[in-house]
Amino acid sequence: MKIGHQFHTVALVGRSNTPGIAEPLASLAACIAKRGFEVVFEADTAQAIGSAGYPALTPAEIGARADVAVVLGGDGTMLGMGRQLAPYKTPLIGINHGRLGFITDIPASDMREVVPMMLAGSYEREERTLLEARIVRNGEPIYHALAFNDVVVNRSGFSGMAELRVSVDGRFMYNQRSDGLIVATPTGSTAYALSSQGPILHPQLQGIVLVPIAPHALSNRPIVLPDDSKIAIQIIGGRDVNVNFDMQSFTALELNDTIEVRRSKHTVPFLHPVGYSYYATLRKKLHWNEHPSSEDDDDA
């Protein structure tokens, strides 16, 4: 068993518009408060479920006050809170109340048993990288964002191919005609990048993956770059080209706009139950080894 730091103040976060989330959040709050932890709620979550008796805090206030944030929802909820809390280094615990759950790895049915043990110090910790990106127009930055999974430059559904000029560390890589280009973290390699035939990167691997979306030339293949690379994607052709930062869209791109992407100085600490296995997650979520032996289960 791995013993880490015991926490004191615990922030609870849920996807506020999800039906049926109020009861498990209230149940978890009562469970951990009974064990002596101070419980606070993220403000939108508190408003949605009516968490009377617990302080309601903004993400910035959570970052300043809470020792850990417990997120009940899907991967999207976890990604959004991770971006907001990244500057504060607040650790995240993810409880799966969504569908896929690559990064919310605790089943909701187990949370009342597992979460208190983790808050008491029994957990495994890892750091996840983020990307920071900005849009540059006529030499001036006009937009800035963080991305946990990916930065995606793509065409709209009704326009032709986008034409992109891609440079890495100031050196020309290629011009590409395609439906778009994905720049993904190791965490994001199992998201949109995977559906576009990109490789899976272990989350502790220091790399950034570029994955073309339906390229005109089949020789345009995914490539994994060092994670200190500085990537520049210039719009040189096409119309109605968009850029998304973890599905947060900026839709007003113009010809010659450049999207600059690099690893963020921030990382997000993820906490897992003792015995967590990334490979077991892949096996379960991607349906590898559908009929494992009991020996395989013991090694998970």
UniProtKB/Swiss-Prot annotation:
Coiled-coil zones: none
Signal peptide start and end residues: none
Reactions performed catalytically: NAD(+) + ATP = ADP + NADP(+) + H(+)
Active-site residue numbers: D75
Pfam families: NAD_kinase (PF01513), NAD_kinase_C (PF20143)
Entry cofactors: a divalent metal cation
GO MF assignments: ATP binding; metal ion binding; NAD binding; NAD+ kinase activity
GO cellular component: cytoplasm
An individual GO BP term: NAD metabolic process
Alphabetical UniProt keywords: ATP-binding, Cytoplasm, Kinase, NAD, NADP, Nucleotide-binding, Transferase
Superkingdom, natural source: Bacteria
Gene3D superfamilies assigned to the protein according to its UniProt record, in alphabetical order: Probable inorganic polyphosphate/atp-NAD kinase, domain 1, Probable inorganic polyphosphate/atp-NAD kinase, domain 2
Residues reported in the UniProt entry to bind NAD(+): D75, G76, N149, D150, R177, D179, T190, A191, Y192, A193, L194, S195, A214, Q248
Cellular location(s): Cytoplasm
This enzyme's EC code(s): 2.7.1.23
PANTHER family assigned: NAD KINASE (PTHR20275:SF0)
Functional description taken from the UniProt entry: Involved in the regulation of the intracellular balance of NAD and NADP, and is a key enzyme in the biosynthesis of NADP. Catalyzes specifically the phosphorylation on 2'-hydroxyl of the adenosine moiety of NAD to yield NADP.
Annotated family: Belongs to the NAD kinase family.
Alphabetized NCBIfam families for the sequence: PRK02155.1
Protein name (record): NAD kinase
Native species: Burkholderia pseudomallei (strain 1710b)
